[in-house]
Amino acid sequence: NIMQEAQDQNFISDHTKIDVRTKVINTTDASGKNIYNYDVEVSYTVDEEYSATDDFAPGRFKCEESNAALAMLAIVKKALTGDFSKYMVEGKQVKVQITGMADALPFRRTVAYDGCYGDFDQEPVYKNDELSNITVTEATGISENEQLAYLRAMGVKDYLDRNIPAFGKMRTTFDTYIEVSQNKGGAYRRIGVKLTFVDAL
């Protein structure tokens, strides 16, 4: 069991709950062929009294700055190099949906962005499931929660690029989703990942 092993190795603490949901979806491809896609969705929650230590602090976006985010990504890595590696087939199609979330805490000033994930100019992004675009560069810095949510998502992409080389051999597409809550608090500053292995079964 991935979760148990991760807990034993202290990837995750008792107060971070990581949820891995899988489902098989019967659909048809572009040519009308009947195929089965395999969906893997990973999310997490943190016990309220630990949110301040384990969730992203206000204005923070690097995965390393959230114990819970890093724990979730460690689980994703473990799954993709272990139990789910049989779906990581060279030349096969995988769709990766990454979600960055931000809360409603207003910005008092622009926060510096060190350009660690590159500059983003008019990049396509799904905001509340509607296709939109976003700009955040070292020069602009971060002045709104949408940008913060986007950089949290880019941290996920960066982690996957660095830790799962198999994606480079697959036909991998990344879609970025951002969610900005009306509420304030660490519970609304999180990340999520959904993988769809196309024609996997």
Per-range role (PLM):
Residues 5-6:
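Catalytic core of IPPT-family isopentenyl/dimethylallyl transferases
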Residues 10-12, 19-21, 26-44, 54, ...:
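Periplasmic OmpA/Pal-like peptidoglycan-binding modules at the C-termini of bacterial envelope proteins
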Residues 27, 72-96:
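Short amphipathic alpha-helices and their capping/turn segments at secondary-structure boundaries
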Residues 44-59, 96-106:
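Short loop/turn segments at strand-loop or loop-helix junctions that form parts
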Residues 59-68:
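Surface-exposed cleft-lining segments at the edges of enzyme active sites
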Residues 67, 71-79, 151-155, 159:
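Extracytoplasmic/secreted proteins, especially bacterial periplasmic and envelope-associated proteins
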